[in-house]
Regions:
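BZIP DNA-binding basic region
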Residues: 28, 34-37, 47-48
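Short beta-strand element of the conserved SAM-dependent methyltransferase core
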Residues: 2-5, 44, 97-99
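Short Cys/His-rich "knuckle" micro-motifs
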Residues: 33-38, 56, 60
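Mg2+/Mn2+-dependent nuclease catalytic core
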Residues: 109-140, 144
Length: 175
């Protein structure tokens, strides 16, 4: 997670933290550890074995992506639009990016079909449009994804697309 709350409940980005201050999870209120090493992406983390109330943080419906690919895309948006907390009943989730009434999700890792459906339905039930941006570079490198120029754009062909897209309605943008 890239954002936490300080003692005054202000939203703070990991790169704006100070070592002498405590930061808290915006979902469950638990104290967080700042991870600002030289190897991995800077981020906040719960203390070991803590179970957060953020519905998808604990892998319950697929955990969060901290890949460089994901963070590069997310960082193209203003911080105020990144990792926005959304709630529907007991379900809590942070959208990668929220602009107006549109959620943008960046997906680098493999995602189970149920997790994809759950997230789409969650956003739809809140009245948001969802745009997914998938990292398909691995599929391109093995020939599963091809493209050719057509008119003023590109025509893509995806051999054996994931079954998560079988029930996707292009017109409505819903599952």
């Amino acid at each position: 997670m890239l954002f936490a709350s300080d003692f005054e409940d202000n939203r703070v980005h990991i790169d704006d933290t100070h070592s002498n201050q405590e930061y808290y999870c915006p979902y469950c209120g638990a104290p967080l550890v700042t991870k600002k090493g030289d190897i991995r992406q800077h981020h906040f983390a719960h203390k070991q074995s803590h179970v957060c109330s953020d519905t998808w943080a604990n892998g319950g419906s697929h955990g969060y992506d901290l890949s460089p690919w994901h963070n590069e895309w997310q960082s193209l948006f203003p911080k105020v639009n990144q990792e926005v907390k959304l709630c529907l009943g007991e379900t809590k989730h942070r959208a990668d990016v929220l602009v107006d009434r549109t959620v943008i999700e960046f997906q680098h890792s493999i995602m189970p079909v149920k997790a994809f459906d759950d997230r789409n339905n969650f956003y739809f039930n809140l009245g948001y449009k969802v745009i997914w941006l998938f990292d398909l570079s691995d599929l391109y490198s093995i020939g599963q994804l091809t493209y050719k120029p057509i008119n003023n754009g590109l025509f893509f062909t995806w051999k054996n697309p994931k079954k998560a897209f079988n029930n996707y309605d292009i017109q409505s943008g819903c599952i």
